[in-house]
Amino acid sequence: MRTWVLATAVAALSVGGARAAVTVFGSDSATQCSKAATDGKSDAASELYCTRALNEDTLMGDDRAGTFVNRGVMKLRRGDFEASHADFDAALALAPKMAEAWVNRGAMWVGERQYQSGLDDLNRALELGVKEPEKAYYDRALAYEGLDNEKAAYFDYQKALELKPNWVLPQHELLRFHVSRPTLPG
């Protein structure tokens, strides 16, 4: 019986987003793919483990979907949005309730400056209970900024920081905001 647990890996893209990898225990290739994604790798050799696992191993259900997510994460780290999109779609076709597939596809959309699509996917990830919601809130804040909704972005950066208090990325983003109260008449 193959088991899987969720883990995360943070990678900075041009949009500065956070990626969530899925740890898969099973075949050697799937395990190596999972480890590479979790360790923040994005090189071709690491991605090859994922491709081998998908092409040669008998992965079922969530393990197969998780391997697509991991390969998509590596592609996303390199800025290969089109290829990562295909992998996230493949994962969602197999496991439509896998929150990590939604959060990563949402990050991909944000990287492509398709902010509304990103927002929709990130909201879905949060609804499904993504394991590290701070990453979804951070990426959603980026989407809100892209949609010129600074107030919502501010609150999502705050929420990301509340969930992970020492995380530098939302701390840095919050430094750009100036919050003031409106002056009331009288």
PLM features per residue range, with description:
Residues 52-55, 59, 90-93, 124-127, ...:
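Conserved structural position within tetratricopeptide repeats
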